[in-house]
Amino acid sequence: MFQPDHYAISVGDVEKSISFYEKLEFEVIKDFRAEDGSVRIVQMKNGNFILEMFRYPDSEKLPDFVNTLGEDLKVKGAKHLGLQVEDVKKAALHLKEIGLVDEIPAISEGRLGRPYFFIKDPDGIFVEIISAR
């Protein structure tokens, strides 16, 4: 009955965020701009999943505690966007090759038995790249 539809994030620079998520195989499907400039909403799609981005002119940056995943996980609330890939090592190399990351991310085995690594989007939001089940 219930299926995932979208995940919403607030961003500081829509164009930087679009560029980042395009490299993760998302494509823009909708781009709304309020006439008064009060908000811009962009939807990007990857498969059946939609990432919805909000940009408000007076938006604030993430709090400092979000700088490390270990500390962030201890705070209640949404934590990260997870994207699955067939080959985590290949994905890590690919992200370095296309310039999305400066260094090849360290891959962890994971307590739940699936290899993964984390990167951050332009606003510091964690994105987990995890092996397919």
What are these model-derived regions, one by one?
Residues 128-129:
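Short glycine-/small-residue motifs
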Residues 17-22, 95, 124:
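Conserved active-site tyrosine of GNAT-family acetyltransferases
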Residues 8-10, 82-84:
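Short hydrophobic/aromatic beta-strand micro-patches
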